[in-house]
Amino acid sequence: MKNNPYIIWLTGLAGSGKTTIGQALYEKLKLKYKNLIYLDGDELREILGHYAYDRQGRIDMALKRAKFAKFLNDQGMMVIVTTISMFNEIYDYNRKQLKNYYEIYIECDMHELIQRDQKGLYTKALNKEIDNVVGVDIEFDKPEADLVINNSCRNNLEEKVELIIKKLAL
């Protein structure tokens, strides 16, 4: 690991597996690193306040997440963040402002996301019952991530976690 700990930013659409992979990564790394914290996007929204779910509201919320991660990282914490925040403005900000930033894109095809639809977001959005769903009526910017993990098949969680650990030399 570099002199400063990483900010590991897992991004992907709702239901792609960010939280599952992020939590598994946290559980594995906390055995080795005491200066580790896990920040879930949904939980941070509860803590930091509800912003609008439109594109600009999502960007504003993502910037708050990034600034909070930076605050913790500047104090020596390794930070794992799981968040949708799939906008070029966020990628650019993070690459410029966050030290030891490592971006992981959890990719999953839309058909599979609709099949999973854990929160009912995609079904409701496609039926025009709700709006402001990233990937349906809010376009997203696919990141040029340091690592892309295809999670269209929800298998091999341990292998995906080990791949991240290997890439970061943790």
Swiss-Prot record:
Involved in the biosynthesis of the O-methyl phosphoramidate (MeOPN) group found on the capsular polysaccharide (CPS) of C.jejuni. Catalyzes the ATP-dependent phosphorylation of cytidine diphosphoramidate (CDP-NH(2)) to form cytidine 3'-phosphate 5'-diphosphoramidate. Can also use other substrates such as the corresponding adenine and uridine diphosphoramidate derivatives or cytidine diphosphoramidate analogs, with lower efficiency. GO terms for biological process: capsule polysaccharide biosynthetic process; sulfate assimilation via adenylyl sulfate reduction; sulfate assimilation, phosphoadenylyl sulfate reduction by phosphoadenylyl-sulfate reductase (thioredoxin). The lineage of its organism: Bacteria, Pseudomonadati, Campylobacterota, Epsilonproteobacteria, Campylobacterales. Signal peptide: none annotated. CDD domains: APSK. The keyword Transcription regulation does not apply. This is Cytidine diphosphoramidate kinase. Its EC number is 2.7.1.224. InterPro entries: APS_kinase, P-loop_NTPase, Sulf_AdTrans/APS_kinase. Keywords: Capsule biogenesis/degradation, Kinase, Transferase. PANTHER family: SULFATE ADENYLYLTRANSFERASE (PTHR42700:SF1). One of its GO terms (molecular function) is sulfate adenylyltransferase (ATP) activity.
